[in-house]
Regions:
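Helix-loop segments that flank and shape redox-cofactor active sites
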Residues: 5-27, 89-106
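Amphipathic, non-membrane alpha-helical segments in soluble helical-bundle scaffolds
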Residues: 22, 26-29, 73-84, 106, ...
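Conserved alpha-helical segments that form or flank metal/cofactor-binding pockets of metalloenzymes
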Residues: 28-57, 123-128
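Acidic/His metal-coordination segments adjacent to aromatic residues that form catalytic metal sites
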Residues: 56-83, 100, 133-134, 145, ...
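Internal, conserved structured core segments that host functional sites
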Residues: 68-122
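Generic structural signal for well-ordered, non-transmembrane alpha-helical segments
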Residues: 3, 30-37, 84-88, 110, ...
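Extended, helix-rich structural scaffolds rather than catalytic motifs
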Residues: 137-262
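Charged, well-structured binding/catalytic surfaces in domain cores that contact anionic ligands
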Residues: 107, 119, 124-128, 132-140
Length: 262
C-alpha cells in the first residue's frame, strides 16, 4: 500500500496549489517509495530471496494494496480525504509493530512512523485550506473511501500478533485508526458514519475482496511493462552474489544500521 500511495503522490504533484504543495508531495512520495524499498530489502534479506524480486518479479495478483487506493481521485477534495485515510491507516499498522519481538522490524517501523508524522501534518494543512466547494467534494467522497479504509483492518487470522511479531492485535490497530479520525470529522464539520461489516467474500490474507486486484491501469503506472520501461530497468539478479561489485570486494553488512538486524 505504501508503494501505491507513493505513486499517487507522484501523479498528483502537478495538481498542487502552491510551491509548498509540490515540494511536500515530492517529499512524501520519496518517503513512501523509499520505505517500500527498505521493507522489500528487509524481506529479501530475511527470507534469502533474490535481490529486487519483490519489486519487479511479482504479478498484479501478488500485490496486497488496500482497495482504498484502487480508484483515482475525482477532485482535490477526494484526494485529500483519501490521503488522510491512507496515511492514518498505514500509521496505525506501523505503530502496531513497535516493540515487536523482532527488534530490527520494530526499529524500522518506528522510524517509518516518525517520518509519517510529517505526512499527516501536511494533509491536515490541506484539509484546513479546502474551499467550500472542495469541502463538499471531500464530504461526498468520504463515505466510500472510509468504508474501504475500515475494511483494510479485517486481517482474518492474526498470526503476527499471536507470535508477538506485531504486539498490537488487528482490533487494536483498528481502534488506533478510528481514534485518529477526529481531525477529519472536525475539518469537514460532520459526524462519521458507523462502520458496516463487509458483506461480500473477503480475502483476509490479501485484505481485499476475494479475487480482486488493483486496476490494470494503476498497476501499469506503478510498474510499467512497456519495452522502453523494461530496457531502462535494472535487470533482476538471480542472487545477491550476482550483482556487479565495482570495487571487487564482497559486500559487508553495515553494522551501524540498526533497522535490518535480526
Amino acid at each position: 500500500s505504501k508503494w501505491v500511495l507513493g505513486h499517487w503522490y507522484v501523479k498528483v504533484i502537478p495538481n498542487g496549489r502552491s510551491v509548498p504543495d509540490f515540494s511536500s508531495m515530492a517529499g512524501m512520495a520519496q518517503d513512501e517509495l523509499g520505505q517500500t524499498r527498505a521493507m522489500l530489502d528487509y524481506l529479501e534479506q530475511s527470507f534469502n530471496l533474490p535481490e529486487n524480486q519483490l519489486e519487479f518479479g511479482r504479478s498484479i495478483e501478488d500485490i496486497h494494496s488496500m482497495e482504498l487506493l484502487d480508484a483515482s481521485p475525482r477532485n482535490w477534495g477526494d484526494f485529500v480525504v483519501t490521503a488522510f485515510l491512507a496515511e492514518q491507516a498505514l500509521w496505525s499498522v506501523l505503530e502496531g509493530f513497535v516493540g515487536s519481538s523482532n527488534v530490527g522490524l520494530s526499529n524500522m517501523c518506528k522510524k517509518f512512523s516518525e517520518e509519517g508524522y510529517f505526512h499527516r501534518l501536511y494533509v491536515d494543512g490541506w484539509m484546513e485550506a479546502l474551499t467550500d466547494e472542495e469541502k463538499q467534494d471531500a464530504i461526498k467522497a468520504m463515505p466510500k473511501r472510509l468504508a474501504h479504509a475500515r475494511q483494510w483492518f479485517n486481517f482474518g487470522s492474526d498470526l503476527l500478533n499471536e507470535k508477538d511479531v506485531r504486539p498490537w492485535s488487528a482490533s487494536e490497530c483498528r481502534e488506533h485508526f478510528e481514534l485518529g479520525l477526529g481531525n477529519l470529522a472536525k475539518a469537514l464539520s460532520l459526524g462519521l458514519p458507523k462502520a458496516n461489516e463487509f458483506s461480500g467474500s473477503w480475502d483476509g490474507r490479501r485484505r481485499r475482496p476475494e479475487g480482486s486486484a488493483m486496476p490494470a491501469g494503476l498497476w501499469e503506472y506503478v510498474l510499467p511493462t512497456t519495452e522502453a520501461a523494461q530496457m531502462a530497468r535494472r535487470p533482476l539478479a538471480e542472487s545477491v552474489k550476482d550483482n556487479i561489485d565495482l570495487f571487487v570486494k564482497s559486500k559487508k553488512v553495515d553494522k551501524t544500521e540498526p533497522f535490518f538486524e535480526q
